């Protein structure tokens, strides 16, 4: 009787391990490809403001580099900076609003190359968020890779170049690109637009008031992308 019971139990276990549901679950886990991550950093003049003695721009650069280095092996990372040319006066608006610099194209993370790509850039001009999102979309369109597609937009302000970032974020979401927004020491009046960008982009809006806040957000996101 005991022999028969053991045989039945073993048969049931074997069936469970070879069932279509188990096989599908195993295949899905094994087949999950690394993510493709684009970080868009605001280099408008207001990012020069210092918090605890460090400019918001430099704080953001440091935390973005730590975030990129913590991503799972095989993750394709891209870094763009927007508004880094011209100046934040009317005389420099046209140049600044056209300034989307793809400083680190989609590739695996290399710390030295990543840091070098940002060495000569500082906070200068206006805030062309829509154009930066559109440039990210074009980069994803040219990327031949599997895995989820995720954008992290870090800014301290709203669109100032006449674009429509909410409409653009919606276009990214149609292409299955998730848009997350980090509002870094932003003016309260900008929250509506930043939150709307994340909402239509299928992502989340994260308020950050200090470098420590930015660090916590990126740590959380790195853990999520590692699952």
Curated annotation (Swiss-Prot):
TM regions (residue ranges): none
Listed InterPro entries: VWF_A, vWFA_dom_sf
Keywords: Signal
Keyword Cell inner membrane: no
Domain VWFA: start-end pairs: 36-227
Protein name: Uncharacterized protein YwmC
Family: To B.subtilis YwmD.
Gene: ywmC
CDD domains: vWA_ywmD_type
Cystine pairs: none
Signal peptide: 1-23
Organism listed in the record: Bacillus subtilis (strain 168)
